[in-house]
A protein has these predicted regions:
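Hydrophobic alpha-helical segments that drive targeting, anchoring, or assembly
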Residues: 52-53, 61, 157
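Ala/Thr-enriched low-complexity intrinsically disordered regions
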Residues: 6-9
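Cys/His-rich, Zn2+-coordinating zinc-finger modules
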Residues: 20-26, 32-34, 44, 60-110
Length: 179
């Protein structure tokens, strides 16, 4: 998955957890590839922004940025808990119930936090270039990523016991990192 800091920051600021356990993975069915249209928008003459595919029944519907928000409506109507992006070059999934980002790995499904991962991938370069491990809260790096906000977010998550041990270990392995 390519990191999407805008999506990640949006989810984080909406109060979604850093990562959590999803207990709905067994709801993933055998899926055909997603369609290139919102099946409901086509039927009613609507328009869509991005597409999502239900991981239970494989229907392809529009996202919450679209006027009709058919995928969220599908979740409310059917209680199908999981969906994935049906957009090219996006391979993330979402559990509506657990409010968790998911991805399929060779070892199975895992939850993850895209904001945490995007920052983790950038902080090593930043620190190696002489960046401060205590940047200003409003510091944004040359890629437009809010690293100051990210440092505060990670430290707060650790202080609150919300940082996964695997994520803490990744950070602690970065030269120059400190809590």
């Amino acid at each position: 998955m390519g990191s999407n800091p805008t999506l990640a920051a949006s989810l984080r600021h909406q109060g979604y957890p850093m990562s959590s356990t999803c207990t709905h993975i067994d709801a993933v069915g055998q899926l055909a590839p997603p369609r290139e249209v919102c099946e409901t928008c086509i039927a009613i003459g609507g328009e869509w922004v991005n597409l999502r595919q239900c991981l239970t029944c494989a229907v392809t519907l529009c996202c919450d940025s679209s006027p009709n928000q058919h995928m969220s409506g599908h979740n409310r109507a059917t209680a199908h808990p999981l969906m994935r992006s049906a957009m090219p070059d996006q391979d993330w999934s979402w559990c509506f119930v657990d409010q968790a980002m998911l991805r399929e790995t060779p070892g199975g499904w895992e939850t993850f936090d895209p904001f945490l991962e995007a920052g983790t991938s950038m902080v090593g370069e930043y620190l190696a270039a002489g960046g401060s491990p205590d940047p200003a809260p409003d510091f944004v790096n040359e890629h437009g990523f809010p690293l100051g906000d990210w440092f505060a977010f990670v430290r707060e998550a650790r202080a609150n016991g919300e940082l996964e041990p695997r994520d803490a270990a990744r950070l602690e392995a970065i030269p120059g990192w400190r809590w």
